Amino acid sequence: MDTTRARKLYNLVMKTASDPRHKKRQDIVQLLFSYSFLDQKINNEKAKEIISKLGEIDTIIADIAPEFPIEKINKVDLAILRLAIYELQFEKETPPKVIVDEAIELAKEFGGDASPGFINGALGKLLKK
């Protein structure tokens, strides 16, 4: 890898890691992940809003990834998709490209090897609709 490309990659990683919005998204993914196992009280307002719309969000997931039933999707990937779909479909404050890029970064941080591709494919399909 050449020096310029390495520097750009380093700056991208450092920007994402130090960005307070990224940290908030990390926290929400962790809350949504734990909520999928324990029906617990959530104190984060955005996470509460997402949970209140899970029926609608999960219907969208079933539509964009029909080969993956909700109950079979990795819980980390599901939490990331739920956050991204909420931001894309209900919040609409952040540009779609930023939301997708953030979701892919979260998948790289928290998910398995196939997670970034799965998240990218599902959200790409949603954006084409």
Where in the sequence are the language-model features?
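N-terminal interaction/assembly modules
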Residues: 2-112, 116, 121-129
